[in-house]
């Protein structure tokens, strides 16, 4: 398989398939796809971890559970993420795992809004 063929195959993958591929590559090569963390952030020296947490601007919305409201949660996940039915169902079924990220890098207001919608549908959600 040429490099171009591999790239085309990756382009045709769904979000769920890409997440599985990344996980498999991490396991196979013992690496992490997470962005490297900076050792020191200019301008925050001497700030306690609690204060840094308060100043956080980008959030990750993580699905922790869905109780007995799976269908309602799937509908809301589809609305928020624009995923297809199968991809949204697969994502909801990953609830409680590190792969159950509904959306990441969102501002606090949007993250709170997403959390509220999901909780109204019966989901248990965490903002990170």
Swiss-Prot record:
GO cellular component, one term: cytosolic large ribosomal subunit
An annotated GO BP: translation
Quaternary context: Homodimer. Part of the ribosomal stalk of the 50S ribosomal subunit. Forms a multimeric L10(L12)X complex, where L10 forms an elongated spine to which 2 to 4 L12 dimers bind in a sequential fashion. Binds GTP-bound translation factors.
UniProt GO molecular function: mRNA binding; structural constituent of ribosome
UniProt cross-references to SUPFAM superfamilies, sorted A to Z: ClpS-like, Ribosomal protein L7/12, oligomerisation (N-terminal) domain
Source organism of this protein record: Petrotoga mobilis (strain DSM 10674 / SJ95)
Function of the protein: Forms part of the ribosomal stalk which helps the ribosome interact with GTP-bound translation factors. Is thus essential for accurate translation.
InterPro entries tied to this protein: Ribosomal_bL12 (IPR000206), Ribosomal_bL12_C (IPR013823), Ribosomal_bL12_C/ClpS-like (IPR014719), Ribosomal_bL12_oligo (IPR008932), Ribosomal_bL12_oligo_N_sf (IPR036235)
UniProt keyword list: Ribonucleoprotein, Ribosomal protein
Domain of life, source organism: Bacteria
Name this protein carries in UniProt: Large ribosomal subunit protein bL12
Gene3D superfamilies recorded: 3.30.1390.10, Single helix bin (1.20.5.710)
Transmembrane annotation, as ranges: none
Gene: rplL
Pfam families the UniProt entry points to: Ribosomal_L12, Ribosomal_L12_N
Family per record: Belongs to the bacterial ribosomal protein bL12 family.
